[in-house]
């Protein structure tokens, strides 16, 4: 079965996500692979595909902060901390928040926190809005290989039949910056 999706085929991507599949899609700098954050089956598939240990934790990417609220606890953020986060969103900055009490370990790994981002990439915004929630999002690359930046690179690493929302990345050179929402500490330079 050929799972490639025509450019902008958001409805087909949502159908695949609802069936616990992992899909590829362009983000601000590189292609991402993602899935339903509420499906342990889908997340396990993603982790196996990436050869990534569950204890490392994952990133959620969303169209809006409202989509992220069920997964994080932002109640302890001060007004200044909240402003620092919202000044960067939507955009290519990922923030680590305390996880909500109900966020599953397959998302947080060994941590009591969760990395989240409100994207400004139009295809991902449309995908998350159509899906009605965030996606688990990690760079589209197999273990030991560089992240994919083009449709052709995704096909070369994952195969011609890997389900993908085709489109261009946002053109940034580096993956998203990662910061602590409470302290502002920089974990990864963007």
From Swiss-Prot:
Top-rank taxon: Bacteria
MF (Gene Ontology): ATP binding; double-stranded RNA binding; L-threonylcarbamoyladenylate synthase; tRNA binding
Kindly report the protein's main subcellular placement as a broad class. Answer: cytoplasm
YrdC-like domain residues are 7-190
User: Is tRNA processing among the key words of this record?
Assistant: yes
Q: What is its EC number?
A: 2.7.7.87
Q: Which GO terms describe its biological process?
A: regulation of translational fidelity; tRNA threonylcarbamoyladenosine modification
Keywords of the record, alphabetical order, are: ATP-binding, Cytoplasm, Nucleotide-binding, Nucleotidyltransferase, Transferase, tRNA processing
Function, as annotated, reads: Required for the formation of a threonylcarbamoyl group on adenosine at position 37 (t(6)A37) in tRNAs that read codons beginning with adenine. Catalyzes the conversion of L-threonine, HCO(3)(-)/CO(2) and ATP to give threonylcarbamoyl-AMP (TC-AMP) as the acyladenylate intermediate, with the release of diphosphate.
What protein does this entry describe? Threonylcarbamoyl-AMP synthase
Instruction: Tell me what organism the protein belongs to.
Output: Salmonella arizonae (strain ATCC BAA-731 / CDC346-86 / RSK2980)
Lineage, please? Bacteria, Pseudomonadati, Pseudomonadota, Gammaproteobacteria, Enterobacterales
